Amino acid sequence: PGKMLLVDTVQGRVIDDQELKEEYAARQPYGEWLNSQLVNLSDLKIPNQKVPQYSREECQRLQKAFGYSYEEVKTSILNMAMNGSEGIGAMGIDAPLAVLSEQHQSLFGYFKQLFAQVTNPPIDAIREKIVTSTTVYVGEEGNLLEQKEENCHVLKINDPILTDTDLLKIRNMKVDGFRVAEISTTYYKNSSLEKAIDYLFIQVDRAIREGMNILILSDRGVDEYHIAIPSLLATSAVHQHLVRTKRRTEVAMILETGEPREVHHFATLLGYGASAINPYLAHESIKQLID
């Protein structure tokens, strides 16, 4: 599994996986490029700054603001924190579709897989190392059709789910070729969502004009006067805006959001354009459960 065979009708022979990969690997000095250009998140120094902390009351207030339920905290978040995996449950769901529900629904609930995909045993990055990876590379992608050393100047992150310390390191990184901008996805409660998204585009365009190539979309700052654009909507909107303006490969998008707390939430955010996610409220909820 995960290996290739090439039937070369010109040479009249079958080229195996090893020979095929060696041929392509030798076309450029990729190893030298990576050694000189690749930056590892794990190698960055932790800045002398503190990660924001919340009291129990503040945490509960934010949980209400982002729509956390008691069951999500006690079953989904707690189970993932204790076991490092999603809880096992029966296939299927008997809850009403979000579009038919009369109750307020998270935007994540409107997105479903087209089919039930099940493998036995489960496929993951541990059991299937040869064909899967959780590593992500953050930064300007450059010309995908041109092989050059500058394209290797990216930040390597071993897991797309960032700790608060990971994000702190990225936010304060001082490495040539990387410029980080933080953009708020909150807006005043008396304003409209449409205006908030338009202003989000203005901030993104300004950051790119100033040479930024890593954007941190953050919804910290939610309070009685400010609400957050749904993280999935903000991610998708910025992604599509950059595609329309033909600048998508110039920047990477990282989320600092209190909204996601289930595997499905993270999957949709990554699928709709996020490179990495810092679920700060889920992390804070775990701390509160421990305390």
Predicted regions, residues:
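Glycine-rich phosphate/ribose-binding loops and adjacent secondary-structure elements
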Residues: 6, 178-291
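Extended, highly charged accessory segments
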Residues: 9, 13-186, 192-199, 205, ...
